[in-house]
Amino acid sequence: TKIAVIDMQMVMNGTEAAQDTQEKLRQEGEEANKRFAEMEESFKQRVEDLRRKKEILSEEKYLEEESELRKLYRDQQSEVQSVNERLSREYKRVQKQISDEVDDIVQDLAKERGYDAVLRRGYLMYASKSVDITEEVLKRADSALKKKMSKKGL
């Protein structure tokens, strides 16, 4: 029986596509967090302004402005959630593309080299370096993903 071992975590995180995506999403997340912090600061200022004006506003006007602030708060929370969900979906989409590509590569490599089984390194207590195909899969995945990215983008 001929067996190979692969470190899937290293492959999934080590491809240029994964690293580029992580960096892109990190930057987008930082930009969004900065924008959200500014929105929160502005919101806090408006709440404080309303508190100060409470004594001089009519009850009707106060309740109207308070209602506007509540709506603004809900809208801001909704936007934060929406951005977080979008970033998460994008990360999962790219991870799925990488995973599908890696699965195909592992199957092709197993057929080429006559492996009867390919096991994940994380499930093993020991495996000789000679049966580790991680680097080969990583190289092939990078090459295949670059081609796909240049055609349609990840």
Task: Name each model-derived stretch.
Residues 1-122, 144-154:
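Amphipathic alpha-helical segments
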Residues 127:
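Conserved phosphate/pyrophosphate-binding and hydrolysis machinery centered on Walker-type P-loop NTPases
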Residues 134:
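Short beta-strand-centered segments that line the small-molecule binding cleft or hinge
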